[in-house]
């Protein structure tokens, strides 16, 4: 599409998003926003697509932009709250994964250190082989 009409790009973004074609929807919303950076619904809908892709931080930025343009735009406030909740949960999940993996990594580090120490004592610093 070579349209210079922001509403055409916005409509295309909506159609692509409805069809589940998130990447093309993002491209269309970006084109709409290039042509009209104050298109509140385009910012909001771009945020929705990013949310679906679990790109919560980017979605929050889009909702913030929509709210900056129109502080009374309730959809953006609602969507931002959901994105922030899910972003927070993803951080909690990552922290739990890190906490689970930390002891494994510490044990591996200790084992590698012990091996390195034994090789050093035998004088085989580079290859780790017995001399």
What are these regions (language model features)?
Residues 4-35:
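Alpha-helical segment of the N-proximal tetratricopeptide repeat
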Residues 88-96:
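Short coil/turn linking the two alpha-helices of tandem helical-hairpin repeats
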Residues 32, 65-66, 116, 123:
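Canonical positions in the second alpha-helix
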Residues 7-18, 41-52, 75-89:
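Conserved alpha-helical positions within TPR/SEL1-like repeat arrays
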């Amino acid at each position: 599409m070579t349209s210079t009409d922001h509403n055409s790009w916005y409509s295309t973004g909506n159609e692509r998003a409805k069809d589940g074609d998130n990447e093309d929807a993002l491209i269309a919303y970006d084109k709409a926003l290039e042509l009209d950076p104050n298109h509140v619904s385009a910012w909001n809908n771009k945020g929705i697509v990013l949310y679906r892709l679990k790109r919560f931080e980017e979605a929050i930025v889009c909702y913030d932009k929509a709210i900056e343009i129109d502080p009374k735009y309730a959809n953006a406030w609602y969507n931002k709250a959901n994105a922030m909740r899910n972003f927070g949960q993803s951080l909690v999940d990552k922290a739990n994964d890190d906490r689970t993996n930390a002891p494994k990594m510490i044990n591996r580090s200790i084992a590698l250190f012990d091996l390195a120490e034994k090789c050093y004592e035998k004088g085989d610093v580079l290859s780790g082989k017995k001399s």
